[in-house]
Amino acid sequence: MRNHRTSIVALATVASLLAGPAMARCVDNSERQAMNMRVLQSELMVAALTCGQQGEFNAFARKFEGELVTHGKMLRSAFQRAYGGQGEPRLNAFVTRLANEASQRSIADRAVFCPRAAELFNVVLNTPPAALPAVAEQQSFSSTHDATECTAEVTREASSVKAPATKAKSR
């Protein structure tokens, strides 16, 4: 059993290292919210499987289906913009990395992970749907996506870059 756990942790660590940063570019606020929502969803999914909280996860998925779908589409769109044809595989690697990291947290200290997960399910299931992104952002694990939010300065710099001038063709 111990060797099996060690193998899982080693595999998860390698997978998370290979996945690299979540995005090659900075993300806007709505994309960051979508990433935080996906991190929360992954954490709760691992909690459901690890801690026997499938009923709570199903209640979460039913209650927040609309928000999860909306943020999922936003996340898919962000990865398509950032990576073009590689958007889907990069998104899949990102989601896998999040699940692996949540699994690592559960394995590292299950005695703490499961009670915290129960508290988190309680908070989430008592949260109005519109407030779920704020709850997701407040979690200590929400920054595990490693995405950097665009600042006004970055946005200003990007908009001030001009395309190179082209010479007019002479007739």
Predicted regions and their residues:
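N-terminal signal peptide c-region/cleavage motif recognized by signal peptidases
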Residues: 19-21
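Bacterial N-terminal signal peptides that target proteins for export
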Residues: 1-10
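Hydrophobic helical h-region of N-terminal Sec-dependent signal peptides
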Residues: 12-17
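Immediate post-signal-peptide N-terminus of mature secreted/exported proteins
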Residues: 25-59
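N-terminal secretory-pathway/extracellular module detecting exported/lumenal segments
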Residues: 2-3, 23-36, 89-92, 144, ...
